[in-house]
Amino acid sequence: MTNERPLILITNDDGVWAKGINELIECLKDLGDLVVFAPDGPRSGMGSAITSLVPIKYTLLKKEEGLTIYSCTGTPVDCVKLAINEVLERKPDLLVSGINHGGNMAICVNYSGTMGAAAEGCIFNVPSMGVSLLDHAADADFSECCRLGRMLARRVLKEGLPHGTYLNLNVPKLPQVKGLKVCRQADGRWVREFKRSENASGEPVFWLTGAFESAKPIHPDNDMLALDSGYASLVPCKIDVTDYDFMATLNNWIL
């Protein structure tokens, strides 16, 4: 029988100094011993990128009872890999990535460093979740996000998650949400993605921008609709991306 407190690994893609991750630390600190291992600066949009051509390093920023904070020169996924392989003395009981400044709904899950880190935790068989607020402001109000994130973290610590499954929680920018809906990921894509400009030399340069366009037909239980209706969305995600329904058809192809 062990009396060890749960070990919770926290990371993000906005960097160790972002308000979101520090609000997350405050709302989870009574649930277990926290180890924060996060990028030393913004790494948004990194997805599951890893660093392979240059060395990475980490720096201890703070150590006190129940809380240790490191910064890392790598990507969010690098942070998870390095923390679990080289720094932590035991496997975490939970990984929480966030709180992200900005939403990670629909196909954004494929680009998100926040969700890339959560997926990496899942690959290590650590129950993992990403938490995002639909507000990019540096001083955003994370109150509702913290309330829901903490509630979900407590439940995951108690119940665990199925093998290969991790969670994606998104919270709208509202003083109070209507509730929490378990959803499917919205289908669609980004359109008008680049804004063309010129640099000082007159050469064309491009800024990433764009708008999300939902695919038709729109499923009524998707995360975008839930968020637009004032609900927080919770999507269970899978590491295994195999299309099992298409396997039989593919086997019948003449290759």
UniProtKB/Swiss-Prot annotation:
Transmembrane segments: none
Bound cofactor: record note: Binds 1 divalent metal cation per subunit.
Cofactor section: a divalent metal cation
Pfam families with a match to the protein in the record: SurE (PF01975)
Top EC class of this enzyme: hydrolase
GO molecular function, one term: exopolyphosphatase activity
A Gene Ontology cellular-component term: cytoplasm
Catalytic activity: a ribonucleoside 5'-phosphate + H2O = a ribonucleoside + phosphate
Keyword Signal: no
Cell compartments where the protein resides: Cytoplasm
Keyword Hydrolase found: yes
Binding, a divalent metal cation: D13, D14, S44, N100
Record key words, sorted: Cytoplasm, Hydrolase, Metal-binding, Nucleotide-binding
EC number of the protein: 3.1.3.5
InterPro entries, alphabetized: SurE, SurE-like_Pase/nucleotidase, SurE-like_sf
Family: Belongs to the SurE nucleotidase family.
Protein's job: Nucleotidase that shows phosphatase activity on nucleoside 5'-monophosphates.
Name of this chain's protein: 5'-nucleotidase SurE
